[in-house]
């Protein structure tokens, strides 16, 4: 048996490979820390705001972070942090309305990966070894390499489809293409699928189309039913393809507070207020190193549409990342979720990651 998770149709039973068992063990330890210091708080109808000192966060450190933003990252629109289930830091800049959704760009990929996890839990997808060729056979163009029909859900999730992709040039080609799915599935194969990581927004869109097909609903309707409404997320606009399908790789709009909810779902091992949205084993595998990643995520590793890293202090962490500096950054050991959001489209010379600000917030947290 390969060291990948195998979800069985019609059953909650999950078979684990070595990496998944290790991930669950590590997550159990950090979850125990969180449970030891706070009861579960569920922000479905709104976040609780608390004094940072009540949750072991140094307010002087947070004030120092807030003061750096206007001069150092003037494009930043919002910076928020949740610890122990309550907001302990929340700042908006440049006139940003807290209730106005922001285009989270490639953070959309982490939403799509989550929807794949829900579909697996519901038995709508047979398992991670199921292929796009089995689910959407009629979407393959006649020029597609036969290898592409055999690309599995695991490979789409981990960006190891082996399809050639240039992060900027092919994104522009995708936007101009009359059929995003056909354009992606018709790309050249440059390696054996499953062997090499290549960042591919088109692949995330294909993943979303397979989830929609399996659910029998448009992806946005499925997302609203199984993810957005249960978490109390009110999305804004969602970019659409020429086929009138929402873009599963980029272009969803969310408020910064709703972005926090997605990170909090994973921090709580896929559970939300007594309901298991995704299986704990899927949440663990999604946020565990599966493939090597590349410079797109600062050479972090890659899970299931999440980037895998560690803080400067060495705490395991994972994050969703969007063009321009959109972040949902989760540090389980600290029971911490940080969101950074940028509302306007940036010129290339303005691009500057707020990662060091996130690190400063993490450094302000006193370990439990």
Q: Can you say where each PLM-predicted feature lies in the sequence?
A:
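Active-site helix/loop module of the DD-peptidase/beta-lactamase fold
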Residues: 103, 122-161, 186, 215-250, ...
């Amino acid at each position: 048996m390969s060291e990948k998770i195998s979800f069985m149709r019609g059953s909650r039973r999950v078979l684990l490979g070595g990496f998944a068992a290790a991930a669950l063990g590590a997550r159990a330890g950090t979850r125990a820390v969180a449970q030891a210091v706070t009861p579960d708080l569920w922000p479905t109808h709104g976040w609780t705001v608390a004094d940072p000192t009540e949750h072991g966060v140094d307010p002087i450190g947070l004030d120092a972070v807030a003061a750096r933003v206007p001069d150092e990252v003037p494009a930043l629109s919002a910076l928020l942090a949740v610890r122990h289930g309550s907001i302990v830091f929340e700042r908006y800049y440049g006139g940003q309305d807290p209730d106005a959704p922001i285009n989270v760009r490639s953070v959309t990929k982490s939403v799509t990966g989550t929807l794949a996890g829900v579909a697996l839990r519901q038995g709508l997808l047979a398992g991670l070894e199921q292929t796009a060729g089995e689910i959407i056979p009629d979407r393959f163009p006649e020029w597609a390499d036969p290898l592409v029909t055999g690309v599995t859900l695991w490979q789409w999730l981990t960006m190891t489809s082996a399809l050639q992709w240039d992060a900027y040039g092919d994104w522009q080609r995708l936007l101009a293409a009359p059929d995003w799915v056909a354009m992606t599935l018709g790309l050249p194969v440059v390696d054996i699928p499953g062997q090499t990581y290549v960042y591919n927004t088109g692949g995330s869109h294909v993943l979303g189309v397979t989830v929609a097909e399996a659910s029998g609903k448009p992806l946005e309707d499925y997302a609203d039913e199984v993810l957005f409404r249960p978490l109390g997320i009110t999305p804004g606009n969602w970019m659409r393809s020429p086929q009138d399908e929402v873009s599963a790789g980029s272009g969803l709009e969310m408020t910064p507070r709703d972005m926090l909810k997605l990170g909090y779902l994973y921090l709580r091992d896929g559970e939300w207020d007594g309901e298991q949205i995704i299986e704990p084993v899927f949440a663990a595998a999604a946020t565990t190193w599966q493939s090597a990643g590349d410079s797109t995520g600062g050479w972090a590793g890659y899970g299931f549409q999440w980037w895998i890293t560690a803080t400067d202090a060495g705490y395991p962490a994972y994050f969703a990342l969007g063009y321009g500096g959109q972040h949902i950054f989760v540090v389980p050991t600290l029971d911490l979720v940080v969101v950074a959001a940028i509302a306007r489209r940036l010129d290339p010379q303005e691009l500057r990651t707020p990662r060091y600000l996130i690190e400063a917030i993490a450094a302000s947290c006193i370990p439990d």
